[in-house]
Amino acid sequence: AFFQGKNDRAQGFSYEHRGEKVTSVVYDFSIVNPPADIAAQLGIAEDDFAYHVVRVRQADEKPIVIEYTYMPLELIPGLKKKDLYGSLYRFIREQCGLKISSFHRTIRAVAATEEEAERLDTKPGSPLLELTQIGFLDSGAAFEYSVSRNVGDRFELHNVTSVSYTHLTL
């Protein structure tokens, strides 16, 4: 069956947790040549540069998710470490003037590594919900490749799915 999810806006962590005190702990902010498989997902050459961000997002001082993100340097100019403590999607919209149009997501269950467990205030091996996503701009360019690992009992996924009957097979 073919299903298509639809959101009316790019809803990141800050939006989903509006009304709560949202904070970030940044563990890495660097400019790198991304691994070949990630460069391919972003549609850039292996020798092109990308931001690499590792941060934990918290709601009301409770760690919810650890994010591992790559973004092409050329598409998102001027990103600074101070911007990582707020909404990256807001920075992309307001500071870069870009329009986020869609995400391709894969969701699966994984076990927390020792390092992730420490950063997320949980136990090693605890269940995490992993969202791997590629974010696209209205131009069709991929602006983000990220893997987010969410603490299972502190995360909810809300999705609206519409069925396209022209592609539906039973």
Identify the residue ranges that each predicted region occupies.
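Acidic, proline/serine/threonine- and glycine-rich low-complexity intrinsically disordered segments
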Residues: 162-164
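Acidic, metal-coordinating catalytic segment for phosphate/diphosphate chemistry
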Residues: 154-160
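Conserved small/polar residues in nucleotide/adenosyl-binding loops
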Residues: 166-170
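N-terminal helix-turn-helix DNA-binding module of bacterial transcription factors
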Residues: 1-3
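Mid-protein regulatory/catalytic core that forms ligand/cofactor-binding pockets
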Residues: 9-151
